């Protein structure tokens, strides 16, 4: 179509051409009809949106996404307003697949409870299939009984230090995580040996390499789940105190990652994911999230008198003010300064 008319073809028009002209005249592509029509339609509309973003200068030229390298394997939606996507406590009905049992029961709101499932996706990670659904829920009323604000300072020694006195340890230093990291190194070495053996013409089978890859992927997935769960628990516990606002620092994570001695530790802390999840939770509960500029000297400023200690080193874990004699943990002092900071942006 583009070669003949030299114009951009919208998604809806391309879908009509594909179904009414191209596939009937090209029998070798009839396999497209074997999957759900909504999945094909969604792929076309995704490409339509990607090209429109490119033409508007919002993003770069779209790249072809190979199916085997994508986590999302299937997309399904409601066909019209009168139909529903059936879901029960222990199973969900997926187009072309039928009823599929769910391992974790009771996580998805069911249609019997009055909820409406608008769409869903089936994805695969580390050899396991996951289904996620978009559910229409009634607006929840947020409580307005707010207390005072709090400041949160993120770090490497401890993950988060809160101005109310709470300190959340670095989970990557626990024996549980270290044990998984040790096992991950061992499995990665085994995978490397199999690759080297295959290059040298050894007897290693590709099926065995695939099995070893799954072992490594499962360990990575488990590590990611442990860290994400820890972040969710910290945010939930913080939001339950019902602060009127939460203040955090706009960390330059990309710049911090350039330090080769700290890059691994910084990446494992997942600072950006913490900010994104906190932002969503604050919006859900009507809490104001304040973002302080990264150049604000929260650690070097005395919370008692306001003087700035410019010679404070990263190795100095205790803040001692030469002006007024105030002494406190440097991270706790920073969280207090973030709480009282008056120059900020609202996320």
What do these predicted ranges mean?
Residues 2-6, 55-60, 244, 282-289:
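Surface-exposed helix-capping loop/turn segments at secondary-structure junctions
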Residues 5-7, 36, 50, 73, ...:
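Intrinsically disordered, low-complexity regions of eukaryotic proteins
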Residues 5-9, 20-22, 57, 114, ...:
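Short, flexible coil/linker elements and helix-boundary hinge sites characteristic
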Residues 7, 11, 33, 205, ...:
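Intrinsic-disorder-associated interaction segments
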Residues 110-113, 125-347:
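Positively charged, helix-rich recognition surfaces that bind polyanionic ligands
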């Amino acid at each position: 179509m583009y070669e003949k008319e030299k114009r951009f073809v919208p998604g809806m028009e391309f879908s009509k051409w594909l179904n009414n002209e191209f596939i009937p005249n090209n029998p070798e592509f009839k396999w497209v009809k074997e999957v759900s029509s909504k999945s094909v339609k969604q792929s076309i509309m995704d490409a339509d949106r990607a090209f429109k973003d490119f033409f508007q200068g919002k993003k770069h030229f779209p790249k072809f996404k190979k199916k085997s390298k994508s986590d999302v394997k299937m997309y399904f939606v409601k066909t019209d307003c009168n139909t529903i996507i059936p879901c029960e406590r222990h199973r969900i009905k997926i187009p072309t697949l039928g009823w599929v049992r769910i391992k974790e029961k009771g996580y998805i709101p069911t249609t019997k409870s009055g909820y409406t499932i608008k769409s869903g996706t089936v994805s695969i990670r580390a050899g396991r299939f996951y289904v996620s659904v978009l559910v229409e829920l009634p607006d929840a009323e947020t409580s307005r009984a707010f207390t005072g604000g709090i400041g949160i300072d993120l770090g490497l020694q401890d993950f988060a230090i809160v101005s109310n006195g709470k300190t959340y340890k670095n989970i990557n230093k626990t024996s549980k995580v270290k044990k998984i990291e040790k096992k991950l190194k061992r499995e990665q070495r085994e995978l490397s040996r199999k690759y080297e053996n295959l290059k040298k013409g050894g007897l290693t089978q590709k099926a065995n390499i695939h099995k070893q890859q799954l072992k490594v992927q499962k360990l990575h997935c488990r590590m990611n789940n442990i860290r994400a769960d820890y972040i969710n628990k910290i945010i939930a516990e913080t939001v339950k105190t019902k602060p009127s606002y939460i203040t955090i620092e706009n960390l330059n994570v990309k710049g911090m990652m350039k330090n080769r001695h700290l890059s691994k530790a910084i990446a494992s802390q997942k600072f950006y994911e913490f900010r994104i999840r906190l932002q969503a939770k604050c919006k859900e509960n009507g809490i104001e999230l304040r973002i302080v500029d990264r150049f604000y000297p929260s650690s070097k400023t005395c919370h008692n008198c306001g003087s700035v200690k410019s010679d404070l080193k990263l190795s100095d874990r205790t803040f001692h003010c030469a002006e007024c004699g105030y002494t406190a943990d440097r991270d706790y002092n920073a969280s207090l300064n973030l709480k009282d900071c008056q120059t900020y942006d609202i996320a």
